[in-house]
Design a protein with these regions (language model features):
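Membrane-interface helix-loop junctions and terminal tails of multi-pass membrane proteins
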Residues: 1-258
Length: 258
């Protein structure tokens, strides 16, 4: 259904608006399922309460897969400003297209977060810890040290964007078989398992900032603050990591296999 809607947007409103619409849908699905699994694990009286980190990382991997498969044919399913920045540097998209991706990603992330709020509406009041409520929307560090937290996000996003460029490279056999999206989802799963412990692996500015804004404005009972003092970390770190990954990929690997 969502893929059909994305196709309609492309046909009726021309390719660039189709990109915006597709990224709204894809990123909305990403956040609905990704933040949704976090809410399922953390919120009181959820049937999945306390099911743990493995469930969260698996859920985020599936969220990437669903969002990307839904709109991939219409926009490429960036779903992430750091990916968009990396692909812009790599030359896959133009600067005039990039801002349309950014816009769609932010709107989609906010819509997805709102749907998570609605889905778990009855559980917010029964959850006492405001930190758990915030964690259902945005990331936070296990140990707060801004320098190291930024570095962690740079490393995680570097792996993500470098991996995407490698997986999607023209010489890869998986491009013809339709496995690219599945491999990217597994890449995100691997990043979460291996590198997600220190900061919760935002690796996506829209994934963190959009839901954090929604946390701030939604009437969530006993929600506490939105931790704006940390909010720049999961924005700046992923953007740096995505840019460095594209620069490194082009310098070391380029457009042809080794």
């Amino acid at each position: 259904m969502f893929a059909h809607l994305a196709a309609v947007l492309v046909v009726v409103h021309k390719p660039h608006l189709g990109i915006v619409g597709s990224e709204i849908i894809g990123t909305g699905l990403l956040i609905l399922l990704g933040d949704g699994v976090v809410a399922a694990v953390l919120l009181a009286k959820s049937k999945a309460e306390n099911s743990g980190w493995i469930v969260i990382t698996l859920g985020w991997g599936m969220a990437v897969m669903v969002g990307a498969y839904s709109v991939g044919p219409f926009s490429g399913a960036h779903l992430n400003p750091a990916v968009t920045l990396g692909l812009w540097i790599h030359g896959s998209i133009t600067g005039s297209m990039a801002w349309k991706y950014f816009l769609g990603e932010m709107i989609g992330a906010m819509i997805g977060a709102f749907l998570v709020f609605l889905t778990y509406y009855l559980h917010w009041r029964d959850t006492e810890d405001p930190g758990l409520k915030l964690a259902c929307f945005s990331t936070g560090p296990a140990i707060r040290n801004y320098g190291w937290n930024v570095l962690t996000e740079i490393v995680g996003t570097f792996v993500l964007v470098f991996g995407i460029l490698a997986i999607g490279a023209p010489w890869q056999a998986n491009n013809a078989s339709g496995l690219t999206t599945l491999l990217v989802a597994l890449l995100v799963l691997g990043i979460g398992l291996s590198l997600g412990g220190p900061t919760g692996y935002a690796i996506n500015p829209a994934r963190d900032l959009g839901p954090r804004i929604m946390h701030a404005i939604l009437p969530i009972p006993g929600k506490g603050g939105s931790d704006w003092s940390y909010s720049w970390v999961p924005v700046l770190g992923p953007l740096i990591g995505g840019a460095l990954a594209a620069i490194f990929f082009d310098a070391v690997i380029g457009s042809a296999p080794l």
